[in-house]
Design a protein with these regions (language model features):
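N-terminal intrinsically disordered, cationic/polar leader segments
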Residues: 1-30, 40-113
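Short, conserved glycine- and acidic-residue-centered signature motifs
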Residues: 31-35
Length: 113
């Protein structure tokens, strides 16, 4: 399973993304490709448009991205995209966001608290 955790820190925002979608499951390769696309789009945007981006690969399948406050819109977009993926394929990806207080509802909507 892929896990994506969005948090705030003293500088801005952090995304910790780790794990792998299981290829044995029918959705595994699709979820892996979709999550990777969202992740690499986020990194590309932050690298070109935002200040102070840091990326650390702790091990294969375990990466941390940090950015300052100006990266918040891109982080939100990535979080929403990954949440939509998790709503469709909950067996392959989970998303936790303490950064904005978002929660998932049973009607497949994202709610801001």
């Amino acid at each position: 399973m892929i896990s994506a955790v969005f948090e705030r820190n003293d500088v801005g925002f952090v995304l910790r993304m780790y794990g792998h979608a299981e290829k044995e499951k029918p959705s595994g390769e699709l979820v892996c490709a979709a999550a990777s696309g969202i992740f690499y789009s986020l990194i590309g945007y932050l690298a070109n448009e935002c200040s102070g981006m840091k990326i650390r690969t702790l091990s294969p399948g375990n990466t941390v991205v940090e950015c300052r406050e100006d990266g918040e819109p891109a982080m939100k977009q990535a979080c929403i995209g990954l949440i939509q993926l998790a709503l469709t394929y909950p067996e392959s990806i989970e998303v936790v966001s303490s950064a904005w207080g978002w929660s998932l509802t049973r009607s497949n909507n994202i709610r801001l608290d």
